[in-house]
């Protein structure tokens, strides 16, 4: 084990990862139809074994209750029949989306008979580490197969029974298709998940989904590229020129529709000129919705009961708790977001078009919204079918990452005996003529 506590991979883990890698190489060369059929078979198998999966989840929930698991984690852990049915529908919808592979992004004649193209291809093998949410196994497995990638998944121990039941069903579905069952696998121990971080050369991308601590640890302890976000500290700024009724609906939805989500707001910023009017309606509305408000001095003077400390501004509650601050103007709101935001999703409520456009240009987050809930920051709601996670990094992919974020590209050059010397010595000339991209 190295100084940071990450062990060397065992022989069994190396064997598993090698098998996934080999299956991924074949999968990456499969046809769109083969991958679509694989997804439909996975969905059918999940449906056939729904009772087994829900029963396994009940075991996990009972153990979570006995262990005193935090309410936010319990909410993510639950996979009842309705939630499972929704996840299965998502797999089927994903199969109908446009094939992300083989898309020709560039088609160029470099010289007579020498043609270059840039075509989308799979990344290879995804290593996905997540906490609680067992439906993530379904989403990630489906996205991986659809995009031609293998996947090694490791869920939290709190969802062990559910994850195993789901993976068993997925593999049983793949067994009747041309896609190898080895393209997907599940790790079950903490030692394996740590050693996964050492599999550079076998794993091409690590995707962590979970707490700030989990993501930070992974980023600090692997040479494999990491896609993800460490925090979801999202804001709603209520401008001085605003439809208060509309803004309140947006605020309530952004906080309460699913408070355990990373795209729920954690801080409400209100312009001082509208604060007396807006908070008069907002405070009782939030209280009725069961939200605990913590505010600065100005907001407490307007009805917010609890005191917000400096720690609250950077806190991802994942619960029915909301920090409230009254700001003197637009610029102070921007400065607060720059200082405390996590570059996930920020929103403004305003009827002033110029103010909205300035906000949309100035805020450097993966998602920046005008007059709508932050809860729309989601791959399914964006029409991606599903997502492997949300990335807050500046380099792409950014925001909800669906199929397009799980592919890279390859340059292919076809010639007729061309050599570079002919061009450098003047016997041949480059034409650099763009051709229609069309299909591969």
Curated annotation (Swiss-Prot):
GO molecular function, one term: NADP binding
Top enzyme class: oxidoreductase
Pathway(s) per entry: Amino-acid biosynthesis; L-proline biosynthesis; L-glutamate 5-semialdehyde from L-glutamate: step 2/2
Keywords recorded for this protein, A-Z: Amino-acid biosynthesis, Cytoplasm, NADP, Oxidoreductase, Proline biosynthesis
UniProt catalytic activity: L-glutamate 5-semialdehyde + phosphate + NADP(+) = L-glutamyl 5-phosphate + NADPH + H(+)
The keyword Transmembrane helix is assigned to this record: no
GO cellular component: cytoplasm
E.C. numbers: 1.2.1.41
Location in or out of the cell: Cytoplasm
InterPro entries, A to Z: Ald_DH/histidinol_DH (IPR016161), Ald_DH_C (IPR016163), Ald_DH_N (IPR016162), Aldehyde_DH_dom (IPR015590), G-glutamylP_reductase_CS (IPR020593), Glu-5-SA_DH (IPR012134), GPR_dom (IPR000965)
GO biological process, one term: L-proline biosynthetic process
Entries under PANTHER family matching the protein: DELTA-1-PYRROLINE-5-CARBOXYLATE SYNTHASE, GLUTAMATE SEMIALDEHYDE DEHYDROGENASE
Record function comment: Catalyzes the NADPH-dependent reduction of L-glutamate 5-phosphate into L-glutamate 5-semialdehyde and phosphate. The product spontaneously undergoes cyclization to form 1-pyrroline-5-carboxylate.
Protein family: Belongs to the gamma-glutamyl phosphate reductase family.
Name by which UniProt lists this protein: Gamma-glutamyl phosphate reductase
Organism: Synechococcus sp. (strain CC9311)
């Amino acid at each position: 084990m190295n100084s940071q506590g990450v062990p060397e991979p065992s022989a069994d883990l190396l064997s598993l990862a090698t098998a996934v890698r080999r299956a991924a190489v074949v999968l990456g060369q499969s046809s769109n139809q083969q991958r679509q059929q694989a997804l439909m078979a996975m969905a059918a198998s999940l449906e056939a074994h729904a009772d087994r999966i829900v029963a396994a989840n009940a075991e996990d929930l009972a153990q979570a209750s006995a262990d005193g698991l935090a309410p936010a984690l319990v909410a993510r852990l639950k996979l009842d029949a309705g939630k499972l049915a929704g996840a299965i529908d998502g797999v089927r919808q994903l199969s109908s989306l446009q094939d992300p592979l083989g898309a020709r992004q560039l088609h160029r004649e470099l010289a007579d008979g020498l043609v270059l193209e840039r075509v989308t291809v799979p990344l290879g093998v995804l290593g996905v580490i997540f906490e609680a949410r067992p439906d993530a196994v379904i989403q990630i497995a489906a996205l991986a197969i659809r995009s031609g990638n293998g996947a090694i998944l490791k869920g939290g121990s709190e969802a062990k029974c559910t994850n195993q039941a789901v993976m068993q069903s997925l593999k049983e579905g793949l067994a009747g298709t041309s896609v190898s069952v080895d393209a997907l696998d599940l790790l079950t121990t903490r030692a394996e998940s740590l050693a996964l971080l050492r599999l550079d050369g076998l794993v091409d991308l690590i995707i962590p989904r979970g707490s700030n601590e989990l993501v930070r640890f992974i980023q600090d302890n692997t040479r494999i590229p990491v896609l993800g976000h460490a925090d979801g500290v999202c804001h709603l700024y209520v401008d001085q020129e605003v439809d208060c009724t509309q803004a309140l609906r947006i605020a309530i939805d952004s906080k309460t529709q699913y408070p355990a989500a990373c795209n729920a707001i954690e801080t409400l910023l209100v312009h001082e000129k509208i604060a007396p009017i807006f908070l008069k309606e907002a405070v009782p509305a939030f209280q009725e919705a069961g939200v605990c408000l913590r505010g600065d001095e100005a907001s407490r003077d307007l009805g917010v009961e609890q005191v917000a400390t400096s720690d609250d501004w950077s806190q991802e509650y994942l619960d029915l708790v909301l920090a409230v601050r009254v700001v003197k103007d637009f610029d102070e709101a921007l400065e607060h977001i720059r200082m405390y935001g996590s570059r996930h999703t920020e929103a403004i409520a305003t009827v002033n078009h110029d103010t909205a456009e300035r906000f949309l240009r100035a805020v450097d987050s993966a998602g920046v919204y005008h007059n709508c809930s932050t809860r729309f920051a989601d791959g399914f709601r964006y029409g991606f079918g599903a997502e492997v996670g949300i990335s807050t990094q500046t380099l792409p992919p950014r925001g909800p990452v669906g199929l397009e974020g799980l592919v890279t590209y390859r340059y292919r050059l076809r010639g007729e005996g061309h050599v570079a010397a002919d061009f450098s010595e003047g016997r041949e000339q480059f034409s650099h003529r763009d051709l229609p991209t069309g299909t591969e």
